[in-house]
A protein has these predicted regions:
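Substrate-binding cleft of extracellular glycoside hydrolase catalytic domains
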Residues: 1-75, 82, 86
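Acidic (Asp/Glu)-rich catalytic clusters
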Residues: 2-6, 36-43, 101-105, 133, ...
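Alpha-helical scaffolding within the catalytic cores
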Residues: 31-35, 93-101, 122-131, 147-155
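Loop/turn elements at helix/coil->beta-strand transitions in domains of secreted/extracellular proteins
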Residues: 41-47, 84-90, 105-108, 136-141, ...
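Aromatic-lined carbohydrate-recognition surfaces of secreted/lumenal glycan-active proteins
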Residues: 49-51, 73-99, 138-149
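Aromatic- and acid-rich polysaccharide-binding/catalytic face
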Residues: 97-120, 166-169
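Substrate-binding surface in catalytic domains of secreted glycosidases
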Residues: 112-133, 138-139
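Substrate-binding cleft of secreted/luminal carbohydrate-active enzymes
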Residues: 139-176
Length: 176
């Protein structure tokens, strides 16, 4: 899935130049729909965060720029919800840049991934406020990946209320 490990071009798949690539995308969405439907039938809601960190370009879904990415995000949304009838998803968007925002109707929660450096426990207020600016509507904002956990006192002081945070792995989890 890393850009430097594949020759797949999302732009070509989405604009019709790579019909096999487009079909591969549909097949992948259809395969995951089976699993999501099983969770739906079991009454399990899913925080669904597909195609994360797109604006970074290090994953294939972000390597072709915002337009093909947004097309893919919307394709996935409609394929899962309209075609397959999946209705247990809470859509968590994590494109990290307003140019990549697919639109309010496709997003329930806006997520930010932040790795500020070793032993940086700030509230990340600037990134929180940036995430708020992606839309004119009210959206929940989450810290969907992080290194150090923000200091609760700094969160309170700055009035920054991330809905949740998800400390990714490694030293941030294992060391005190």
């Amino acid at each position: 899935f890393y850009t430097d490990s594949t020759k797949f071009s999302l732009k070509k798949a989405m604009n019709g130049e790579d019909k096999a690539g487009y079909q591969m995308l549909l097949d992948g969405i259809d395969a995951i729909a089976v699993e999501l439907k099983a969770m739906q039938e079991a009454g399990v809601p899913v925080l669904w965060r597909p195609l994360h960190e797109a604006s970074g370009g290090w994953f294939w879904w972000g390597a072709s720029g915002p337009e093909p990415y947004i097309e893919l995000y919307k394709l996935m949304y409609h394929r899962l919800t309209d075609y397959h009838g999946v209705n247990n998803l809470i859509w968590v968007w994590n494109g990290q840049d307003a140019a990549w925002y697919p639109g309010d109707e496709y997003v329930d929660i806006i997520g930010e991934d932040i790795y500020p450096g070793e032993k940086v426990y700030t509230s990340q207020a600037a990134r929180f406020l940036k995430a708020l600016s992606y839309t004119d509507t009210r959206k929940i904002i989450a810290l969907t990946e992080n290194g150090c956990i923000p200091d609760p006192e700094l969160l309170k002081r700055d009035n920054i209320m991330w809905a949740w945070w998800c400390t990714w792995e490694g030293e941030f989890v294992l060391k005190s």
